[in-house]
């Protein structure tokens, strides 16, 4: 009888550890969500913040994802460069996570400056968003990642930051596959 209990023990311990790790991730996300700096608005070059974010995330993750950056050298926007870096890091990390099973993982980032706004488009070659959950992509605690891989707060927090910068963040699927996230921000000045 004790042997049977011992056999059941490891899966129970594993489940408890997995649950604790998820709780830790949720708490960390909530801390980030509640402690976002609301500092002074300042003009900054979104292209520089993007390049730094891509470099940092790809290097830290050890991913072999191929990132294509096609953005103008100057994208003048205003707000908090630190908060916007948090958004960009999250978008790049999500692309890495969703393409980890792809032998030729790719993330294409295109940017353009329009008359009054800057637009960045992030397209990966992962599975994309399940159609039935596309409208929930920015809901707090919604995630399509396996347990222990995400809290479901990253896109929600990013959406809130972008809104506070008077911008928009939209999710869609590319007709040829993969997720597309489009970030639009007003130009500085």
Tell where the protein language model's regions lie, with residue ranges:
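Short beta-strand/loop element within the Bergerat-fold HATPase_c
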Residues: 104-116
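Short alpha-helical Gxxx[C/S/T] motif in the catalytic ATP-binding
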Residues: 154-158
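Acidic ATP/Mg2+-coordinating residue in the GHKL
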Residues: 124
């Amino acid at each position: 009888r004790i042997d049977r209990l011992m056999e059941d023990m490891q899966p129970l311990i594993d489940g408890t550890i997995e649950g604790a790790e998820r709780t830790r991730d949720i708490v960390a996300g909530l801390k980030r969500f509640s402690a976002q700096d609301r500092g002074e608005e300042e003009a900054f070059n979104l292209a520089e913040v993007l390049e730094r974010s891509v470099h940092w995330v790809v290097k830290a993750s050890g991913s072999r994802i191929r990132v294509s950056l096609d953005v103008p050298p100057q994208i003048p926007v205003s707000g908090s460069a630190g908060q916007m870096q948090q958004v960009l890091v999250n978008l790049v990390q999500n692309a890495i996570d969703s393409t980890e099973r792809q032998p030729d993982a790719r993330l294409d980032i295109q940017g353009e400056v329009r008359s009054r706004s800057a637009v960045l488009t992030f397209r990966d070659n992962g599975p994309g968003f399940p159609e039935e959950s596309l409208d929930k992509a920015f809901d707090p605690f919604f995630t399509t990642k396996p347990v222990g891989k995400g809290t479901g707060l990253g896109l929600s927090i990013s959406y809130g930051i972008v809104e506070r910068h008077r911008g928009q963040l939209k999710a869609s699927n590319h007709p040829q596959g993969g997720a597309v996230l489009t970030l639009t921000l007003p130009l500085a000045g």
